């Protein structure tokens, strides 16, 4: 057998360059679970602002919105060119995915006013009904469960309950933490919407745990044993008896 000639310096550098390219591509894929999407954030308080920052870091485009969008200019400037500012109507039209992070009493009006823009879209709902803030409708939503209630308020969307069971301060401090990541419970009726939501949870720096359909969202509603608890995925599954 004829001995193989040793690689030339040029050949070695070519191989190293190829290996580096493959490694960088794999690292990029691992860093962003969801293909880059446009996310319209309706309600840019602490929750909405934190998620906007986390998703921009992961390569997604966001539109942050409020009733007074001029007040969001400094946040948008800090987030960079992947962030835009608009009204709630603008965000509803902009996003292929919608993040709803408003006081719960506003949910029915949003469903009514932006039904056309939201139709058929994946909507992540982080709202929680608090009677002291939202009035009697919150009592009814708690009795029925936030999942079925939001589904009624937001007809025609592909609804997923998400990010309602973590306080705003923990979104930035706990995202991508070392070791086992914090879990975010999800519930929805649409498997494809749940898959999209789970990918965006990972991109935000957390581990998704699918609890069930929207009727099961009450298991992580306000007042549930796991509400706002910092649990890993295995701890959350154990607490909710999810196999």
Residue ranges and their predicted role:
Residues 127-176:
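Rossmann-fold NAD(P)-binding glycine/threonine-rich loop
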